[in-house]
Amino acid sequence: MSEGMEIGGVSLRHLAQTVGTPFFIYDEAMVENHLHTFRECLSHPELETQVVYAGKAFLCGKMARLVRDAGCGLDVVSGGELAVALHAGMPAERIVFHGNNKTPDELTAALKAGVGLIVLDNAPECAALAALAEQLQCHANVLLRVNPGVEAHTHEY
């Protein structure tokens, strides 16, 4: 690590000496800039668009607040990520709940929170969500992910 290497004006050598290694560092200004740029580029008066940050890339309360403050949505894949998003003040209607093998408790939490979109992977999950929504007397916006079973033959690497 060279003496002058910095991210966001912070010396990496200083960080390594202060917090130890390895460590992750995100440049807050750069993240904010990218989120705003995506929103600007995808904004069109004839389209209803939403930029959604994938929490599985990295999620903590601070990142959720950055995403929220940029006016973007947040994609979560577990009940834990949903809890982080809600605790950070992310509006539930801007949360997209993905994740395979979502538990009944996770689906219930998403419904009770009023999550904007729940992505379903199969018919049994759709039936389970419908039953829970009926039981809770609420509405769910869903997207059904379909795998048509078409094989794409690609190289081995």
Predicted regions and their residues:
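Glycine-rich, aromatic-flanked loop segments that form ligand/cofactor-binding clefts
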Residues: 139-151
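A charged N-terminal "starter" segment
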Residues: 1-141
